[in-house]
């Protein structure tokens, strides 16, 4: 059985139960707030919420960010199954997960992403589900970069034509002409600086704004190739 599609809580290796505490706080936020957009995911979107670019683009959009640093596909899936999207009715769910599934194949991870999409759809039948591409990682070209690119390719194929599911490439400008990634864009060659966040958030903001502002966006949006 593919472990990426089996809902699993993050192991409490430190023994302080922080992950479960964060999850419960997110559930509480759902009861108290009425977001238009919910972000679900991992370290990439957990860290960008502290950048100037996030405050510029997404703070005004009535967003909740339910991203947790070490999450893999199976951990986000567990959170969805255990209340992360209960008592809330956002117009859009942005799902970014998979880059931490380093021990799984690209195909397994893509199936894990699809399992999350399916579960989100069960919880929120009419919400738009937006899937930003996984980013390249590592200062120089490496196998994890290649795998993330393959995951993006497989996810595009698995989700093409699904109701109100949209993929969006957000990696433009991160890899330089010599194949390297600058620490000015990714401070640890995985997570983003403010400059890097601006590069990935602009195309995402454009898509979310279109969905939120159009009366009938499903007539204007076509699934990404």
UniProtKB/Swiss-Prot annotation:
Signal peptide segment? none
Give the highest taxon in the source lineage: Eukaryota
In terms of InterPro entries, this protein maps to: SGNH_hydro (IPR013830), SGNH_hydro_sf (IPR036514)
Under the heading SUPFAM superfamilies, the entry gives: SGNH hydrolase
Among Pfam families, the record links this protein to: Lipase_GDSL_2
The UniProt family comment states: Belongs to the 'GDSL' lipolytic enzyme family. Platelet-activating factor acetylhydrolase IB beta/gamma subunits subfamily.
Q: How is this protein organized at the quaternary level?
A: Does not interact with Lis-1.
**Per its record, how is this protein called by name?**
Platelet-activating factor acetylhydrolase IB subunit beta homolog
> Per the UniProt entry, what species is this protein from, by scientific name?
Drosophila melanogaster
The taxonomic lineage of its organism, from the top, reads:
Eukaryota, Metazoa, Ecdysozoa, Arthropoda, Hexapoda
* Encoding gene (name): Paf-AHalpha
